[in-house]
Amino acid sequence: MTVRVRLAPSPTGTLHIGTARTAVFNWLFARHQNGKFLLRIEDTDKERSKPEFTENILDGLRWLGLDWDEEPVIQSERIEVHRQAISQLLAQGLAYRCYVSEQELDAMREAQRASGQPPRYDNRHRHLTGDQEEAYRAEGREAVIRFRIDDEATIAWTDMVRGPMQWRGADLGGDMVIARRAPATTVGDPLYNLVVVVDDAAMAISHVIRGEDHIANTAKQLLLYQALELNCPTFAHTPLILNPEGRKLSKRDGVTSIGDFQEMGYTAEALANYMTLLGWSVPEGTEERFTLRQAAEVFSFDRVNKAGAKFDWDKLNWLNAQVLHGWSPAELLAALEPRWQKQGWVVSDPLWANDLAVLLGPSLTLIEDGVTQARPFFEEPPLEEDGLKQLEQEGARPALQALLSALELNAWDGLDVERAQTLLKEAAASAEVKKGVLMKSLRAALLGRLQGPDLITTWALLARLGHDRQRLRRCL
């Protein structure tokens, strides 16, 4: 059997990290099994589905390195196939038209809640006579189409993550709506559980890998597979992603879309690595930092956890820093320059930009940190509190004056480490202060604060633009 899995996102929003993690698990399983990873765009929600969301989803998958093997299936283009399946169920007496109005359904649910019962459809239109249907049509009522669910039925399957699973028909909320409300002589728009079954069968999907919030849907869909006499796939229900407090991750938690992570400066490699670890345990002796290709070699569902996976920002940040610290200067600069340009910063000297990237690289956790840390090299920074305090130290300003005087007396052709150390030593001696006091004061003058990258390299980079003397003058 050829393994065929699919990701089936709805283009009603941008690519969510939960969908992306599902994509990662599907892709890893397909690649490990030498199978196929497919896409189906479930765009049947006409009001909310937008082409720009489809493009966002596809772009996000490409960015993460999740390639697919066949042209994406567009679900809305198959609506007549879905309607044919519904007509088949109607003809076999396995589905029926239900004329209960929305107001009547609301009243039914309210009465059930008032009596302490879970809300469910009570199947009241399951056995309508022809005359009763005609009477409802005469009233102008439209009908949904419902699939009959036997309350006594037992639905069982073996889940690749959770093992043996079993549901009772009585726990599925009554007969299931499989087509929206429409005039009684037509079939309305087919709904999720029906179209998923029809499309997965048509795509010859062998394994359905999705979140645990779909478990109840799986029970319903298994009944539809049986009724339509379709081959049933194997199911795997992965754990939900939880926020650090243990609740389901949602938009209220802030960053949830892949685009948000990109904007913040996370790398595709680190994010894909981390999403793999959200619910999957690496085999013993395997490093937690890996590429998707490396993970695919050892991925299996017997190491996917049942419990929800808490999102750990510290772990993601550590992975991202490890990736950035392994980048070449050229790779780092390619990521930083577009962000610098977005700030309006013009780099006229490629060698200078390369040296700045080399200087900043070891301290970066996020690519966006390379904007924050680069700002003093493009813009004159304000003097922060710790910098101001340093400049008030005894001997600080006289030492900076001595350093500035030495710079202005000499037409330096460049500032190397040896020359910088000599200048610092001589200026400190001239002002009768310790060299360390001068170095702290110089950092405050150049960067506006006492924290930052290597001082001599910082000074040399600013000197190449003539900014060092200007910043010394403002502090005197």
Curated annotation (Swiss-Prot):
Q: Where is this motif: 'KMSKS' region?
A: 248-252
Residues bound to ATP: 251
Q: Where is this motif: 'HIGH' region?
A: 9-19
Per the annotation, which location comes first and is thus the protein's main one?
cytoplasm
Give me any GO biological process, just one: glutamyl-tRNA aminoacylation
Where in the cell does this protein reside?
A: Cytoplasm
GO cellular component annotations, sorted alphabetically? Answer: cytosol
Q: Which reaction does it catalyse?
A: tRNA(Glu) + L-glutamate + ATP = L-glutamyl-tRNA(Glu) + AMP + diphosphate
- Keywords, ordered alphabetically: Aminoacyl-tRNA synthetase, ATP-binding, Cytoplasm, Ligase, Nucleotide-binding, Protein biosynthesis
Q: Which InterPro entries match?
A: aa-tRNA-synth_I_cd-bd, aa-tRNA-synth_I_codon-bd_sub2, aa-tRNA-synth_I_CS, aa_tRNA-synth_I_cd-bd_sf, Glu-tRNA-ligase_bac/mito, Glu-tRNA-synth_I_codon-bd_sub1, Glu/Gln-tRNA-synth, Glu/Gln-tRNA-synth_Ib_cat-dom
Q: What GO molecular function annotation could you give as one example from this UniProt entry? A: zinc ion binding
Q: Which Gene3D superfamilies match?
A: 1.10.10.350, Glutamate-tRNA synthetase, class I, anticodon-binding domain 1 (1.10.8.70), Glutamyl-trna Synthetase, Domain 2 (1.10.1160.10), Glutamyl-tRNA Synthetase, Domain 3 (3.90.800.10), HUPs (3.40.50.620)
Q: Which family does it belong to?
A: Belongs to the class-I aminoacyl-tRNA synthetase family. Glutamate--tRNA ligase type 1 subfamily.
Assembly? Monomer.
Which protein, by its recorded name, is this?
Glutamate--tRNA ligase
The protein's organism comes out as Synechococcus sp. (strain CC9311)
